[in-house]
Amino acid sequence: MAMTLLSAVAGESIFLLGPPGTAKSLVARRLKLAFKDGQSFEYLMSRFSTPDEIFGPVSISLLKNEDRYERVVQGFLPTAHIVFLDEIWKASPSIQNALLTAINERIFQNGDKTLRLPMKALIAASNELPAEEEGLEALWDRFLVRMVSNCIQSEAEFFKMIRNQAIQDVAVPSDLLITETQYDSWQQEINSVQIPDEICAAVSCIRKQLKEQSKKEDVNVMDYYISDRRWKKCFHLLQTSAFLNGRKAIDMTDIPLLVHCLWNKSETIPAIIDMVCSSLTVKADKQIEKLSKDIDKALKEKSKQKTGTTSVSDSNLSVTSYFYYTIQSYPHGKCLFYKADYEYVEDYTTGKTTDGIVYPDNDKKAWIVRAIYTGAPFAYKTKTDANVKKVKLKKCTGGIFIDGIPYGFEKVKGANATLFSSVENEASVTLQTLENKVQPEFEKLKDLFYNSANLFLTEDDLKLSKKQLSLCEKRLEEMKIKAQNAQQLL
């Protein structure tokens, strides 16, 4: 319901995809109540529907007495504020052509008269998408907002619906009704809503992913094609959302609305969701990626200054239970690395990794990290306990990388802790950048979704957005650990 209101205020058409009995027509009846003296028109299309049934019958008296071809439009689409057309794809070509003009220009040619349509939104519905190669592409492209209308999924909500009485008309207070004057005034204010650079960056991220997706094998380019006209309308929809939420600029909480604007086939919806969600954290993700590469580069450059392969010295490192190095700052508790495996682990400067496993050892009350290599004990290579986790290992001077995160081995007291001073500086700079720039900016983004409400985000939109934020927060924490551990390797 909220999205249809948003579409109406933005002057856009909306398509509802879903099976019968999901209250699609009720949406149109309710939406007209938002407008003062609002009129609605609804019709169930069939292959035999004629323009007379949609736009009004031809006036026999005018045709007979004045030789004028003119329709009686009162009570039909040309006089309605909200239009609902069910089974839209069954419309005949003549109806489709008239609808295109009505949607695009908000006019209807009635004989020699050009009628300005009061239509705020055309809501179309069907349980299927338009068939390919039947000339429906132009009409399909005019529906900016595309929503999937499913049956109630929650059992609690289902029985709540069952127990409720029949839905009655809602009386909207007169001071809340949208008048024509107010609607026209809003359009001017909506156009002045600002589009910040961070919004442009998020959309650029989506556009880049759309292009990459369309280049994949066995993918129809048109499945991910979005015209410039459609992008222009998307931004106008976001501006409308910001305006109705009382803002003077679009913010990141408006971006998830694009999920309902960018898919062309139902099969592409999951990919579109991923693209839109990833754009929410694109700034933080890029910063994290750059900082990670900076640390890796600094470690490699300093490592190249040392001769021979990466190694560790027992004289500098603390050995536990005769056979293990203690891994510092492992997030899940005490962690030991089997020292004999170290020489079989790939050096991180090669860009390669060695397979390994992490598993709990109840006797040692610690997590054990082992490398898997030819000649390793059979028991470790085939360990399949539920608590065994497969990891990727790389060695570095004085420590080990586990799934890309460096961990230092515990050193004996008095051991040299400044092997690579410039790396320490790089790690310190990274930590400062994370704490002073990346983290605060991310917290502001997170606050938008957790502590401010966007009227038009569905529960699913919000859930997907928060999931993306959680993934980014996890990457941010991993980056902190990587930077902190890089310091401990020194």
Model regions: which residues?
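C-terminal helical "lid" subdomain and adjoining coupling/linker elements of P-loop NTPases
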Residues: 194, 209-283
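Pre-Walker A adenine-sensing motif
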Residues: 1-7, 71-72
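Short glycine-rich substrate-engagement loop in P-loop NTPases that contacts/grips substrate
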Residues: 47-78
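Canonical AAA+ ATPase core
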Residues: 38, 61-66, 82-95, 101-177
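Conserved RecA-like P-loop NTPase ATPase core
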Residues: 4, 16, 54, 86, ...
